[in-house]
């Protein structure tokens, strides 16, 4: 079996990702297969992946089955994997009895005051408040706006451990200020200081990673996600769509970059 620690460190031997969306397209035309997608939400087709594009409800289970049956990679190797965080999100749901978005909203975002943060922003904001993500000409064939960029996360109802979270710089600064404060913000405690220290410290013999967090590269021969001006106490995470959040306890500094 897989160890949670190895999954958090991206050294659980899972593949980086599995491209499931291509299986749902019509061969030759690369357009949505009408057996899998409907232009309207209806019984059996309620998973919205874009405008006028609702996926069959059984496909998330198919995707999880693909992950579960995928071959494992080499031992003692660091490979960043979307599948790691997809599984972690499912573990949170299984333990809490809540969907991942419900759990995060209830225990963190609402209490902290992160009112612009959450999954599926179309359900909470007017269209004029949303920024277009991309012009998708390979899967959804439209301008994607208010729907997650990642195809797999879209197929998981827009809620997944590896992608789908929308936010802004102010909200993210609140979250990371709570972490810098040792788990407390505005008189409310969310996490124990020792928990934050454990997760944001170097935890691997084969990579620079913390538990879930990225860290500065200590090996001068390897590329680092940050410049040399930040301390080894610092931690954060980058995002595929051009995002980065980083905190340095030694300088009490938070850096948020959302492109």
What are these regions (language model features)?
Residues 6-9, 118, 245-246, 254-258:
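Structural recognition of the beta-strand scaffold that forms the well-ordered cores
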Residues 234, 241-254:
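Short, surface-exposed beta-strand/loop micro-motifs that present aromatic residues
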Residues 92, 179, 249, 258-259:
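Short beta-strand segments enriched in hydrophobic/aromatic residues
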Residues 2-233:
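Short, surface-exposed loop or secondary-structure junction motifs
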Residues 207, 239-241:
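Short acidic/glycine-enriched loop/turn segments that link adjacent beta-strands
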